[in-house]
Regions:
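Short, positively charged
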Residues: 104-108, 218
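Amphipathic alpha-helical scaffolding segments
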Residues: 17-20, 142-143, 260-265
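A generic structural motif
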Residues: 3-8, 142-144, 249, 289
Length: 308
């Protein structure tokens, strides 16, 4: 975030960040309220030095103690003037993100969520002289710990992986470098196939968004809810073969490996499990079989790879 005073007088304002933490299952978050409202947990570091930067950080650790080894972190590249982690405290009873109570009152309540709906919000009070400019980096990230290194002390999560993550992006210069690298990555991917027409919307759809969605499909398959991790339904044999047609020109090496993974689940008679697990590379007849067009799509995907 870059803020510049283009006026002729000093300006005094406050900036708020606001995120709502998922409790690790987006679908369940929206319906299992009698359970979810009892599980939320956070830790807050109002001021901490990471590298050469003073920062503030909020850690979302719901179910970390009970059965998880991961947590989320929201941080800002300065020592914040206030924070909130309780949604009701920040927004207000019957309030709305369109006009949060804390913003309306120009304050923060330094609330600590214990159950209910954990959020992350920082308040930064800013003073700008005429022509003065200030920059802030807001970060949201994810960290994991091995089971034998979950805790820093009793009840306090091990934050070392979070510190390493935050130090990579906690200055405007580091942020600019990371953003440039991300732009180079996508420019390289998307430059493999370019359409030039008079219809700029068509160009944007074909050259950017369609190819981007194909890459998302490669990374996530046709996942939903908690299937992203490769559990439950897994990846579809037919789906994955069809998806190859969209991204084989972008990442042919990865497409080749995907073909090998898919083919490894095929039987000697040519039939196949309808789904397979990407983590184990094994199919499961309990979750579907007998889809006779499955192996036909492997031929189409392999042919597309050979042509590429």
């Amino acid at each position: 975030l870059t803020i510049k005073n283009t006026g002729n007088s000093a300006k005094h304002l406050s900036v708020y960040s606001y995120i709502e933490f998922c409790l690790w299952n987006a679908v369940d978050d929206c319906n299992n309220f009698q359970r979810n409202f009892s599980t939320g947990e956070v830790e807050v570091q109002p001021e901490i030095t990471i590298g050469d930067s003073d920062m503030s950080a909020i850690y979302h650790k719901t179910e970390y103690r009970e059965r998880r080894n991961h947590y989320a972190v929201h941080a800002v590249s300065t020592a914040a003037n206030g924070f909130d982690t309780s949604r009701e405290s920040f927004i207000g009873t019957y309030g709305s993100p369109a006009m949060p109570k804390a913003v309306k009152e120009g304050t923060s309540y330094n609330s600590i969520a214990s159950g209910w709906s954990p959020v992350g919000s920082f308040r930064i009070d800013i003073n700008l002289e005429p022509g003065e400019e200030k920059e802030y980096v807001f970060i949201i990230g994810y960290a994991e710990n091995p089971d034998d290194k979950k805790w820093e002390s009793f009840g306090i999560i091990n934050k070392e992986p979070a510190y390493a993550l935050l130090e990579k992006y906690n200055t405007p210069a580091k942020f600019d470098t990371a953003l440039a690298a991300l732009k180079d990555y996508w420019t390289h991917l998307l430059s493999s196939y370019i359409v030039d027409t008079e219809d700029k919307k068509l160009c944007r759809m074909v050259n950017i968004w369609n190819q981007y969605q194909c890459m998302v499909t490669f990374n996530m398959s046709r996942s939903a809810s908690y299937y992203e991790s490769g559990t439950g339904r897994g990846m579809g044999f037919r789906d994955s073969c069809q998806d190859l047609l969209g991204f084989v020109h972008l990442i042919p090496d990865s497409a080749r490996q995907r073909i090998l993974d898919i083919a490894a689940t095929q039987f000697e008679d040519g039939s196949a499990y309808h789904q397979y697990q990407p983590l184990t590379k094994k199919g499961n007849s309990d979750i579907g079989s007998g889809f006779n067009d499955d192996p036909l799509w492997l031929i189409a995907g392999t042919a597309a790879y050979l042509k590429e």
